[in-house]
Every structure is written in C-alpha cells, then in structure tokens.
C-alpha cells in the first residue's frame, strides 16, 4: 500500500486552506460557513422543480361571457375546476381575450416565479385548448402562438369552428400532439368540415366528426337568446348537444390525473 509522504499531506492541507480562503474572500464569509453555503446552494440546484398543473383553456363563441354557465364551454371549465381543486388549472375566456388566456398559461407554467420560462418549464407544459365557433378558431390560434414560444400542446378540440378574420382554424400547428373537430353542415353559420395537421408526423388528427341536426334535432337551448334559437339553430344545437360535449369532456379528462391522486400544485386564481 502506497502512503502519502509528510510533504504531500502538507501540500494537500495548504491547497484546501487556500480554496476556503478564496471562498471567504469572494463571499465575505468564514471559510466553514462559506463551504456550508456552497453545499446548500448545490442541494437547492439539485432539487427537482415543482411540476406545473395541467392547463385546460376553453373559449366561448360569439359575444358570450366567460362566466355564462348556460354555454357548455364555460360550464365544462367550471366542472373541471370543481373536480380538480389542485393539479389542474381550468378557465374559460371570451374569444376576444386570447391574450389574457396566453398570459394565464405563461403564469401557470412559471413554477419558479422568476418571470420567464426555462426550457424545462416549457417542456413540462400539459395544455388542452377547446372552443366553439369563434372560440374554436381562437383555440387553434393560441396553439400557434405557443408554437412560436416552443411550448407544446397536448390537445385542441374544435366544436363547429368558425374562422375569425386573419386566422386559420383548419391547419393545426406542429406543436399540437392531438386534435379533433366536431362540426355540423347546416345553416348560414356552420363549422369547418375538415382540419388537417401542418406536420402529420407530429400531430394526430383524431377525427372530423359530423353531426346532422336536420335529421336528429336536439332541444337543449331553451335558455339561449332568440337569435341562437331561431336563426343559428344548428350552430347552437351543437354547442349544447350532450352527445358532443360528453365526448369533449371524455377527451379532456383522459389527459388529466385521476381525481383521487391530483398533484398538490395549486393553480393561481383565474384572471379575467
């Protein structure tokens, strides 16, 4: 067995003292306290970051208020909030408040609250976007904005999507993992019949599902305004049809954690 000479041992001690002395000079601390600070800093940097909640954003159509629970977009967001007091951030927004929804997403993803998103915080994103009519167009447009920031989206859901001016609601951006489209073809106001992926290798289109209310009408809109009930009838029927929204809810819940084991990350209050 090779033993260190007295000279080698002395040299090692001098090097160790020099390192601690430099640390004390730089940080203004006693050597042992400085070493402890360095150890604590390393432990903090090695600690795993908190996981962000699953984010579910719905957009209402037309000029509907985000808190009008007679409309399924708002009602579904409220249901999810009630089922997931923690671990999920669910909110409905007017379709003209996309920037507010975008800001809410960035705020929820910023788990270390430093005002900017790291690569890890972006990669941790689990986002679901849905909407009806103009709201569906906004959902796709918001997904496209998130693509520019390298933020992935789990799922987009369009219900009788009506394209807004300067938007494209038929081509799903490549940052979206899955997308689905529900539409009806009748009336002067009706949705897109087909959506497609900008990059089929990255986005799976779950389907373009057609509903025909001329053959199978539903009477679910008694609480809606006269215009919706008598002029945009089919467009309104698909907005309140339980057969459609049960499928929408099932698609969303399939991406959420089990309610009995929701994570402890608490979403910030909805800002409207």
Question: What feature does the model see in each segment?
Answer:
Residues 2-16:
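Bacterial N-terminal signal peptides that target proteins for export
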